[in-house]
Amino acid sequence: MSDALIATSSEAPQSPAEQYDPTRKQKSADKTARIPIKIVPAEKLKKPDWIRVKAATGSSRFYEIKDILRANNLVTVCEEASCPNIGECFGKGTATFMIMGDKCTRRCPFCDVGHGRPDPLDVNEPGNLARTIAQLKLNYVVITSVDRDDLRDGGAQHYVDCISQTRELSPATRIEVLVPDFRGRLDKALDILQACPPDVMNHNMETVPRLYKQARPGADYEHSLKLLQEFKRRNPNVPTKSGLMVGLGETDEEILEVMRDMRAHDIDMLTIGQYLAPSNHHLPVLRYVHPDTFKMFEEEAYKMGFTHAAVGAMVRSSYHADQQAHQAGFA
């Protein structure tokens, strides 16, 4: 475990003012206040010159996209997870839609999505999503979600409803899904998804197995590999995809070993990007990976047989997902 972390076996009693309020929008420290890991602020590393975020321009579609999303009661992971690429993506008229609410049942200390008791599923969401995608005239969309451990199918049927209704209104649109791990309900979820599979199936491994306890509490490395392999077995013509972050304390060799595991489990596409801490209340960045190292990861990925590898400091799993799929020959 990193020196920047202290594991806690129980949470201290909260004062009335600190009690969890499911109706209040979580911000900053609220998002990590109830995780099982205590984050002790570490010395902040200076960002290197190669970490550059593109801001939205006045002539871009940034505010238009935000207005359309709010009008249709939709959430994007771009906003909820404080993605550094939001200005560029919204500016180009693209977004990764996040379904099933903005509260996750998991408590991963690298993630800026709020944690808490989720709201009931919005039965109108699949229709709202489909109409928004049609309104934006998108050729390629990514649909992701929070973890919903409170649902018997983990939200698999809601994914299928979103996919099917989107295809009804936009039959030419390619759909990539970035799904949770469906832990405890894997077979049920895969049975449901098989009725209406996406065009690309994505589930992020996130980090190396040694760091799962501190970075992905509640998740299991082998289970995530099994999810993608089993989906591929059932849907051999649908490409599978997964992503990793670097900068959490892993070594280069550990990243390469995960990449080998991915190929051994029939994962086709890969993304690797630099972890950037959303705030001082999240896991700290323990290293900034040099562009030469990213280049090495990319070269090794193609040697291993990945059909496409998007590797670089600002790469995220859904960043330029349409271009990734096109370059891999899937879109």
From Swiss-Prot:
Alphabetically sorted, this entry's keywords are: 4Fe-4S, Cytoplasm, Iron, Iron-sulfur, Metal-binding, S-adenosyl-L-methionine, Transferase
Q: Where does [4Fe-4S] cluster 2 bind?
A: 104, 108, 111
SMART domains, alphabetized:
Elp3
| One CC-aspect GO term | cytoplasm
* The reaction(s) this protein catalyses: [[Fe-S] cluster scaffold protein carrying a second [4Fe-4S](2+) cluster] + N(6)-octanoyl-L-lysyl-[protein] + 2 oxidized [2Fe-2S]-[ferredoxin] + 2 S-adenosyl-L-methionine + 4 H(+) = [[Fe-S] cluster scaffold protein] + N(6)-[(R)-dihydrolipoyl]-L-lysyl-[protein] + 4 Fe(3+) + 2 hydrogen sulfide + 2 5'-deoxyadenosine + 2 L-methionine + 2 reduced [2Fe-2S]-[ferredoxin]
What pathway annotation does it carry?
Protein modification; protein lipoylation via endogenous pathway; protein N(6)-(lipoyl)lysine from octanoyl-[acyl-carrier-protein]: step 2/2
- List the residue ranges forming a coiled coil, or say none: none
Per its UniProt record, the required cofactor names are:
[4Fe-4S] cluster
Which residues does the annotated region (Disordered) include? 1-33
Specify whether Metal-binding is a keyword of the entry: yes
**Which GO terms of the molecular function aspect are on file?**
4 iron, 4 sulfur cluster binding; lipoate synthase activity; metal ion binding
Annotated EC: 2.8.1.8
Q: What is its main location?
A: cytoplasm
Specify residue ranges for compositional bias: Basic and acidic residues: 21-33
Report the protein name in the record: Lipoyl synthase
Organism, by scientific name, is Cupriavidus necator (strain ATCC 17699 / DSM 428 / KCTC 22496 / NCIMB 10442 / H16 / Stanier 337) (Ralstonia eutropha)
High-level lineage:
Bacteria, Pseudomonadati, Pseudomonadota, Betaproteobacteria, Burkholderiales
